[in-house]
A protein has these predicted regions:
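Active-site rim helix/loop that mediates acceptor-substrate recognition in acyltransferases
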Residues: 21-49, 57, 171-207
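Acyl-donor-binding surface of acyltransferase catalytic domains
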Residues: 76-144, 149, 288-293
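Conserved acetyl-CoA-binding loop-helix of GNAT-fold acetyltransferases
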Residues: 79-92, 232, 238-251, 255, ...
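Conserved hydrophobic beta-strand within the GNAT/NAT acetyltransferase core sheet
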Residues: 102-106, 227, 261-265
Length: 294
């Protein structure tokens, strides 16, 4: 293995990085830069024999300011660079910026698990990523949606808390147990608010009686249009309300000019897989999420 050196990028390095990355990788990195999810000084460059051989980037939500995830954009030929050293370099940077935890995502069959485990990350959960190219007309008769802005903030936090009850998503359950239901709901809303979004995208499902029964929060997460949060009250589940909310979200996003919408679901959350499939979301890939507590 070549002796490696690492440093943080500068604005002047971006053209060099672009020339070294694949077209797909550069597009992803440029999206993170465009939406202020990363910045040049959060990009870690690894050099071997004087040549750029590896690139990592710390990223966060647009308005959050503290790194939440690590993205890898370039790996040199096998054995050329000490990737573990690069990860430690990135971790120390995140720690110095005040991060409490970091996430890293790899494909389901990734060979990187030993490396990221060596960097201190622990397997967090398995995730299924879905993609939709257009809404399905599966509205529930007699139900409507309203903008989240029509409700008091306390009402929205309470609705998120209620729709998170008995969740099959292990991440939601982890933070509910650690923080408590209402604190987790408040954190969820705050995280969504740190992303790029239009308040008109966020919808609450309303029953004929006027009672709110569910909520969906589409956002631009790391530059991509995704379902940031969706939930239905436990007593209303299994009656296509999730499909109704997904359809409402898609209508709004389509009007905003988006041609694709993504959603991610815990592999254990079978009911959400069904709702996504019923709403014409197709499985795109399976991933592993790893988490490091700092």
């Amino acid at each position: 293995m070549e002796r490696c050196t690492y440093r943080f990028a500068r604005q002047s390095d971006l053209q060099t990085i672009r020339s070294e990355l694949s077209h797909e990788a550069w597009n992803r990195l440029s999206e993170l830069l465009e939406f202020s999810c990363t910045r040049p000084e959060w990009i870690i460059l690894g050099f071997a024999a004087g040549a750029l051989a590896g690139t990592l980037a710390l990223a966060t939500h647009t308005e959050f300011g503290i790194p939440l995830e690590v993205f890898e954009f370039h790996g040199g030929p096998k054995g050329r660079i000490d990737s573990l050293g690069m990860f430690h370099f990135a971790i120390e940077k995140a720690r110095s910026l005040g991060s409490r935890e970091l996430f890293y995502t790899v494909p389901e069959d990734s060979a990187e698990t030993e490396l990221i485990s060596g960097a201190g990350f622990r397997h967090w959960r398995d995730v299924m990523r879905f993609e939709s190219k257009g809404p399905a007309d599966r509205g529930v008769q007699g139900y409507q949606s309203a903008e989240v802005s029509d409700f008091d903030r306390t009402e929205i936090i309470a609705l998120i808390e209620q729709t998170s009850e008995l969740s099959a998503d292990c991440q939601i359950e982890f933070y509910r147990q650690r923080l408590g239901g209402m604190a987790n709901a408040k954190m969820t809303l705050e995280v969504m608010e740190f992303t790029e979004y239009d308040p008109r995208w966020w919808r609450v499902a309303i029953a004929p009686s006027g009672r709110s029964i569910g909520i969906v929060l589409p956002v631009l997460a790391f530059g991509e249009p995704v379902i940031g949060f969706i939930g239905v009250k436990p007593e209303c589940r299994g009656r296509k309300f999730a499909s109704f909310l997904l359809t409402e979200a898609w209508k709004i996003m389509k009007l905003a000019g988006y041609s694709a919408l993504y959603a991610e679901a815990d592999q254990q959350n079978v009911s959400m897989h069904r709702a996504l499939s019923a709403s014409r979301f197709a499985l795109q890939c399976r991933k592993q999420e790893w988490r490091l507590e700092l």
